[in-house]
Amino acid sequence: MSKKKVVLAYSGGLDTSVAIKWLSDKGYDVIAVGLDVGEGKDLEFVKEKALKVGAIESYTIDAKKEFAEEFVLPALQAHALYEQKYPLVSALSRPLISKKLVEIAEQTGAQAVAHGCTGKGNDQVRFEVSIQALNPNLEVLAPVREWAWSRDEEIEYAKKNNIPIPIDLDNPYSVDQNLWGRSNECGILEDPWATPPEGAYELTVAIEDAPDQPEIVEIGFEKGIPVTLNGKSYPVHELILELNQIAGKHGVGRIDHVENRLVGIKSREVYECPGAMTLIKAHKELEDLTLTKEVAHFKPVVEKKIAELIYEGLWFSPLQPALSAFLKETQSTVTGVVRVKLFKGHAIVEGRKSEYSLYNEKLATYTPDDEFDHNAAVGFISLWGLPTKVYSMVNKEMKEKQEKKEVTS
């Protein structure tokens, strides 16, 4: 009887390398899948390491373009910030990784998929809910959650089975990175009072070390999609990576956040999202210029729900396409250029222009060129305030009647 096949989300790190051997010992043929979503991973090294450790097959996928266009872009257009701070760096990549795991499982005839998440984090939920939504017939395995070893026990298992141990194993932090940013937790960061050491950061410089001269960038959008940076056209994923470099050297995008995890605990996380935070700010400013008041005031309701949906692992739920349909409709006129000054940790929008601009200078000006009909304000104010006026009149009358009644009684 042939062995069962399992498709493993493989990073090349200690946990998933040990998982290959552990799953093999459990009787599975392991197929490793590694994705590059913008963290600069050496895909060939990851592929070869998986085979060396014991995988029967190893797939590597450069998914930066798909990640940026299908997952990051909707989050940008939704200004998706969980709890108004976190740009959903890791949460956005999980549905894409799940999608690729399921696709390869179906191609190879695998009966199961596996991930390297612990039993304490959000990612286990994101992976398993996504996989169940895409193919309910696949079994989902979580080796790290199941074996529940200490770090020392895991290292001992690796040594015993000749599994290569990463040279950065002494790094106290748990890091996840993609083109939308970098997340960092554990070590001293677990103390919410402790100042994050500079060694916890990689994409951004400290404000004290940032240049003393600002840098101006111009970001061009077409229907809500960032397409140019300083006049040069880029694919979305390349534009984000380029902006990470530019904004990061000015200390833009550091976020220190105590967040409410999906599993019920609070967690202190440190994020670096220079490109993401710059783009979100620029995109919103362009929307302020091109969206009507009603759309601009309602959109944050949808944005909050989209952020929660992504964070909570519900990308493939029925609600997501419904929210996306609204989002897509709002972007039809979000075309133009935004000028941003990057300086000492800040991304400051200094200018915006669009052929769809709803800003009319002749209506807004206080100069002699003013074309606003001031006399129209009289009737508008009367009608606008009428409900409040009527309410006040009625209640004043009722109060007077009540006072007279109390005097005579």
Curated annotation (Swiss-Prot):
GO biological process terms held by the UniProt record: argininosuccinate metabolic process; L-arginine biosynthetic process; urea cycle
Positions with a binding annotation for L-citrulline: Y86, N122, R126, S174, S183, E259, Y271
Catalytic activity: L-citrulline + L-aspartate + ATP = 2-(N(omega)-L-arginino)succinate + AMP + diphosphate + H(+)
Record-linked PROSITE patterns: ARGININOSUCCIN_SYN_1 (PS00564), ARGININOSUCCIN_SYN_2 (PS00565)
Subcellular localization(s) per the UniProt record: Cytoplasm
Enzyme class, spelled out: ligase
EC number: 6.3.4.5
Statement: the UniProt record of this protein carries the keyword Metal-binding: no
Binding site for L-aspartate: T118, N122, D123
Keyword entries, A-Z: Amino-acid biosynthesis, Arginine biosynthesis, ATP-binding, Cytoplasm, Ligase, Nucleotide-binding
Source domain of life: Bacteria
Cysteine-cysteine disulfides: none
Annotated residues for binding of ATP: A9, Y10, S11, G12, G13, L14, D15, T16, S17, G116
UniProt pathway annotation: Amino-acid biosynthesis; L-arginine biosynthesis; L-arginine from L-ornithine and carbamoyl phosphate: step 2/3
Pfam families per record: Arginosuc_syn_C, Arginosuc_synth
Main location: cytoplasm
SUPFAM superfamilies per record: Adenine nucleotide alpha hydrolases-like, Argininosuccinate synthetase, C-terminal domain
GO cellular component: a single term: cytoplasm
Any one GO MF annotation of this record: argininosuccinate synthase activity
Record text on subunit structure and interactions: Homotetramer.
Family membership noted in the UniProt record: Belongs to the argininosuccinate synthase family. Type 1 subfamily.
Name this polypeptide is given: Argininosuccinate synthase
Gene coding for it: argG
